[in-house]
Amino acid sequence: MSIIKEFKEFAVKGNVMDLAVGVIIGGAFSKIVDSVVKDLIMPVIGVLTGGLDFSNKFVLLGTIPPTFKGNPDSFKDLQAAGVAAFGYGSFITVAINFVILAFIIFLMVKFINKLRKPEEAAPAATPEDIVLLREIRDSLKQR
């Protein structure tokens, strides 16, 4: 069997196609979760915390150079200028994304496992020798 033919069988018959579909759907689903967190959850958290915007929360680790022309309160401007800053707000947003995504995947796996539960097996057929012995017993009882 040629290597190309073996690869075709592997790619088509194996789990490679399932994995590819999963990765594509996962990428699209992650964008949905990002939007839910960014556009729905974080604004509510911002309102509950008095207008706090997590995406721009950081701790300055270095000094701002005198030639810096951006906004010193903007994490993105500081990053673009190469200033060392610890962006914990961005991390909080990503952590919330992860928790939501992990929970949704957990629910999906749980649902799929529930669908996969095997139906209770019908009782196994009685072996022929047992059936024969019962017939003999019943026949002897009748005499």
From Swiss-Prot:
- What is this protein's function? Channel that opens in response to stretch forces in the membrane lipid bilayer. May participate in the regulation of osmotic pressure changes within the cell.
**GO-annotated molecular function:** mechanosensitive monoatomic ion channel activity
- According to the UniProt record, which cysteines are disulfide-bonded? none
Report the sequence similarity comment from the record. Belongs to the MscL family.
This chain's source organism reads Burkholderia ambifaria (strain MC40-6)
Query: PROSITE patterns per the record?
Result: MSCL
Q: Which HAMAP family match?
A: MscL (MF_00115)
Read off the lineage from the record.
Bacteria, Pseudomonadati, Pseudomonadota, Betaproteobacteria, Burkholderiales
For this entry, the protein name equals Large-conductance mechanosensitive channel
User: What subunit structure does UniProt give?
Assistant: Homopentamer.
Main location class:
membrane
Q: Which domain of life is it from?
A: Bacteria
Please tell me whether the keyword Transcription regulation is annotated for this protein.
no
List, alphabetically, the GO terms of the cellular component aspect.
plasma membrane
What does the record say about its membrane topology? Multi-pass membrane protein
